[in-house]
């Protein structure tokens, strides 16, 4: 495997998510991952895309004082069905309920991205929008899926990188990685602005 170009700056992934760590490893870059401690509650009247972007930036900015030499990557995902947000279900019962609502419908996954330069204070952001069209699913199918994949920590109770891919008819979006939680296409473009190239 070719050696990647030297990294001029240390990278920090502001996330405790194993899914995001696996995605970032795809780029072959050296990085550290630390989970930030922020309040992820939505503000009154806050739009879903604004929430995803704000939380991505807050995650990155929260770690800047402790990592003053780093480029810090923050990302957050919000799932929307109609006018309702689908959060991380947390329990089996809530996961089943979310997927019963998603059955036969389209869920939009909004993934916010922020890369913050702790040295200069400059941030670049992006937002990926992916529409996922779910198959018509009965309760037994959903129960079996939730038991097998345990998507309790995933927005919309859905793991596209796991068995969840069998729940959908199709998806419309620019970057399938964003569905997992980190839009790599936008990330590589933003990193180039900071002088970090994958190739």
Curated annotation (Swiss-Prot):
Task: Alphabetically list the UniProt keywords.
Answer: Cytoplasm, Hydrolase, Nucleotide metabolism
Catalytic activity from the UniProt record: N(7)-methyl-GTP + H2O = N(7)-methyl-GMP + diphosphate + H(+)
Q: Could you say which cofactors this protein requires?
A: a divalent metal cation
Keyword Cytoplasm part of the UniProt annotation: yes
Active-site residues are 76
- Location of the protein in the cell: Cytoplasm
Pfam families of this UniProt entry? Maf
What would be one Gene Ontology cellular-component term for the protein? cytoplasm
- Cross-referenced CDD domains, in alphabetical order? Maf
* Main subcellular location of this protein, as a coarse class: cytoplasm
Q: Quick check: keyword Cytoplasm in the entry?
A: yes
GO process annotations (BP) = nucleotide metabolic process
InterPro entries hit by this protein: ITPase-like_fam, Maf-like
Q: Which family does it belong to?
A: Belongs to the Maf family. YceF subfamily.
What job does the chain carry out?
A: Nucleoside triphosphate pyrophosphatase that hydrolyzes 7-methyl-GTP (m(7)GTP). May have a dual role in cell division arrest and in preventing the incorporation of modified nucleotides into cellular nucleic acids.
In terms of HAMAP family, this protein maps to: Maf (MF_00528)
Q: What is this protein called?
A: 7-methyl-GTP pyrophosphatase
**Annotated source species:** Methylococcus capsulatus (strain ATCC 33009 / NCIMB 11132 / Bath)
């Amino acid at each position: 495997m070719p050696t990647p170009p030297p990294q001029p700056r240390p990278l920090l992934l502001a996330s405790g998510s194993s899914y995001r760590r696996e995605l970032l490893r795809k780029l072959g870059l050296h990085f550290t991952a630390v989970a930030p401690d922020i309040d992820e509650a939505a503000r009154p009247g806050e739009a879903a895309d604004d929430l995803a972007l704000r939380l991505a930036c807050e995650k990155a900015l929260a770690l800047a004082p402790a990592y003053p030499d780093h480029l810090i990557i923050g990302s957050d995902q919000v799932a929307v069905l109609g006018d309702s947000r689908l959060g991380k279900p947390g329990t089996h019962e809530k996961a089943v309920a979310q997927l019963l609502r998603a059955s036969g419908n389209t869920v939009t996954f909004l993934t916010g991205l922020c890369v913050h330069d702790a040295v200069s204070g400059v941030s670049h952001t992006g937002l990926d929008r992916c529409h996922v069209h779910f198959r018509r699913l009965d309760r037994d199918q959903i129960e079996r899926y939730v038991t097998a994949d345990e998507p309790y920590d995933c927005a919309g109770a859905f793991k596209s990188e796991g068995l969840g891919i069998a729940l959908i008819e199709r998806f419309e979006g620019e970057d399938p990685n964003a569905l997992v939680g980190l839009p790599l296409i936008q990330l590589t473009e933003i990193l180039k602005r900071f002088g970090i190239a994958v190739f």
